[in-house]
Amino acid sequence: RGSNLTIHPLRNIRDIFYVGNITIG
């Protein structure tokens, strides 16, 4: 996942936001 962070940073941030949404909701 480290390489993914460098290649697709927006995708990684979106994934974190998605997980955070599930945790909050």
Swiss-Prot record:
GO terms for biological process: proteolysis. It is found in: Secreted, Extracellular space. Its EC number is 3.4.23.-. Glycans are attached at residues 4, 21. One of its GO terms (molecular function) is aspartic-type endopeptidase activity. Placental cotyledons. It comes from the Eukaryota. Keywords: Aspartyl protease, Glycoprotein, Hydrolase, Protease, Secreted. Belongs to the peptidase A1 family. This is Pregnancy-associated glycoprotein 74. It comes from Bison bison.
